[in-house]
From Swiss-Prot:
ATP binds at residues 266-268, 353-356. The lineage of its organism: Bacteria, Pseudomonadati, Pseudomonadota, Betaproteobacteria, Rhodocyclales. The keyword rRNA-binding does not apply. This is Serine--tRNA ligase. It comes from Azoarcus sp. (strain BH72). Keywords: Aminoacyl-tRNA synthetase, ATP-binding, Cytoplasm, Ligase, Nucleotide-binding, Protein biosynthesis. Its EC number is 6.1.1.11.
Length: 430
């Protein structure tokens, strides 16, 4: 959430920066709500002061034995108006809060300006795409003989679900374990196991709600139809980041670095017709997430570090990739700056997103009221960052396609052999 003081003092500048994201700020609506708030607060204070003065006057009159009925009647009238103001003010404040909750984060200075993914800027590449001396197959055709079963997934749950069995299920698990070990043992993250179902206020904290409800899977508890809203997580960023919600942390507790492997559930609203073949876009997929809670002065450096942590996985797997900076029009709602990592997929002859790392600055912290105490004893908002380290399913796709052999077998990347019990090649079922 944006700082309301920023809008109050620099409304036109905020509007200009939001316009870079393709968002039109309704300055008139904000100004009208602000005027109403100020009028109600001013009138409430005036009425309270007048009531207090009249109450003293009543005491003086009664002390003298004089008639105070007229003044008491006036106090009664003031009380009615004061009650009306006190009831109206929270309504206006809630409208202001809802207005702010619908605004995305402001892009950092230096983020490339653009309307969509065509405005993204490549930063660097690593590795050289392999040259094949045979016709390349995609992961769907390769996986069919290795236990990747989209038909069973569709029979069980509908489109965009996958069923895995045997050696490919083992490879999927090996990838997740390898990623977790790298992030915890080499990069200093604390491994976590978090709930996959969360309450509404948790999603408000990280910015998925209220704006993106249609992207979520909603949960209805049997026998509790009147219960509160709950949702399946779309990323473990949600529970990990919210561990500091409504807390005041000691400065020396920062940075906090958390990681978790979890399934992620996304309705993919608005994605009809996109990536309908294979595992690229699924309703359920696994991901190893990285989250950092840091001092505001450290968040830009933490973002660069986090990107390096995601890159390390791809480098260990020897998968070619590139790093791009997302433009203003392609960033996520809560992000001030985002890097995407895109892995090379031979069958598509292009790079596809496999990780997204974002600095959200104080945007999520303000929504969560996550703060730390400075050396001067002042409470300030922390900065939050999140990144994929990595998306497990898309990494599986990249391994299958980049390590395929002419006979349909898959060479296991060296880094994964210990996680596969020494198995070095996946061979198609005869």
């Amino acid at each position: 959430m944006l700082d309301i003081q920023l809008l109050r003092g620099q409304l036109s500048q905020v509007a200009e920066r939001l316009a870079l994201r393709g968002v039109t700020l309704d300055s008139g609506a904000f100004t009208a709500l602000e005027d109403e708030r100020k009028q109600l607060q001013t009138r409430t204070q005036e009425l309270q002061a007048k009531r207090n003065a009249l109450s003293k006057q009543i005491g003086i009159l009664k002390g003298k034995g004089e008639d105070a009925s007229a003044v008491m009647a006036e106090v009664g009238q003031l009380g009615d108006e004061l009650k009306a103001c006190e009831q109206a003010l929270p309504v206006v404040l809630e409208k202001l809060n809802a207005f702010l909750a619908g605004l995305p984060n402001l892009p950092q200075e230096g983020v490339p300006v653009g309307e969509d993914e065509t405005g993204n800027v490549e930063v660097r590449r690593w590795g050289t795409p392999r040259s094949f001396d045979f016709e390349v197959k995609d992961h769907v055709d390769l996986g069919a003989a290795l236990g990747l079963d989209f038909d069973t997934g569709a029979k069980l749950s509908g489109s965009r679900f996958t069923f895995m069995r045997g050696q490919i299920a083992r490879l999927h698990r090996a990838l997740a374990q390898f990623m977790l070990d790298t992030q915890t043992l080499e990069h200093g993250y604390t491994e976590c196991y978090a709930p996959y179902i969360v309450n509404r206020e948790v999603l408000v904290g990280t910015g998925q709600l209220p704006k993106f409800k249609e992207d979520m899977f909603w949960v209805l508890r049997g026998g509790d139809e009147e219960g509160g809203e709950q949702y399946l997580i779309s990323t473990s960023e949600i529970p990990l980041t919210n561990t500091v919600r409504e807390q005041i942390l000691a400065a020396d507790a920062l940075p906090i670095k958390l990681t978790a492997h979890s399934p992620c559930f996304r309705s993919e609203a608005g994605s009809a017709g996109r990536d309908t073949r294979g595992m690229i876009r699924q309703h359920q997929f696994d991901k190893v997430e990285m989250v950092q809670i840091v001092h505001p002065d450290a968040s830009n450096a933490a973002l660069e570090e986090m990107v390096g942590h995601a890159e390390a996985i791809l480098q260990k797997l020897e998968l070619p990739y590139r790093v791009i900076t997302l433009c203003t029009g392609d960033m996520g709602f809560s992000a001030a700056k985002t890097y995407d990592l895109e892995v090379w997929l031979p069958a598509q002859n292009t790079y596809r997103e496999i990780s997204s790392c974002s600095n959200c600055e104080a945007f999520q912290a303000r929504r969560m009221q996550a703060r730390f105490k400075t050396a001067q004893g002042k409470n300030e908002l922390v900065h939050t960052l999140n990144g994929s380290g990595l998306a497990v399913g898309r990494t599986l796709v990249a391994v299958l396609e980049n390590y395929q052999q002419a006979d349909g077998s898959i060479v296991v990347p060296k880094a994964l052999v210990p996680y596969m019990g020494g198995l070095e090649v996946l061979r198609p079922a005869s």
